[in-house]
Curated annotation (Swiss-Prot):
GO terms for cellular component: cytosol; external side of plasma membrane; extracellular space; Golgi apparatus; HFE-transferrin receptor complex; MHC class I peptide loading complex; MHC class I protein complex; phagocytic vesicle membrane. This is Beta-2-microglobulin. Its main location: secreted. Residues 25-114 form the Ig-like C1-type domain. InterPro entries: B2Microglobulin (IPR015707), Ig-like_dom (IPR007110), Ig-like_dom_sf (IPR036179), Ig-like_fold (IPR013783), Ig/MHC_CS (IPR003006), Ig_C1-set (IPR003597), MHC/Immunoglobulin (IPR050160). GO terms for biological process: amyloid fibril formation; antigen processing and presentation of endogenous peptide antigen via MHC class I; antigen processing and presentation of exogenous protein antigen via MHC class Ib, TAP-dependent; cellular defense response; cellular response to iron(III) ion; cellular response to nicotine; intracellular iron ion homeostasis; iron ion transport. It comes from Mus musculus (Mouse). It comes from the Eukaryota.
Amino acid sequence: MARSVTLVFLVLVSLTGLYAIQKTPQIQVYSRHPPENGKPNILNCYVTQFHPPHIEIQMLKNGKKIPKVEMSDMSFSKDWSFYILAHTEFTPTETDTYACRVKHASMAEPKTVYWDRDM
């Protein structure tokens, strides 16, 4: 009985330790197809290598939140870091700016990464 209690305690302590590790997310913003002004496309925000799993992702057009954003299911890598894809339909123009803003416990303030149409 004492062995079982000790084993359960060690497992719980190990799991708690997993949440103590924080990894800062890596953020990539890119379009599905090469951009053409006035032609509908898909804008992706791929967020990887973060821990713990709780994360907030917003996609922005000219600094304002885009309301219709879809999210993939969150998944994890072999190192227990997480990744997720946010995406939305958009029609690029010469003057509009697009970005992805990510808020995570590992960062003091949200990070915004802008879409570079030349990438």
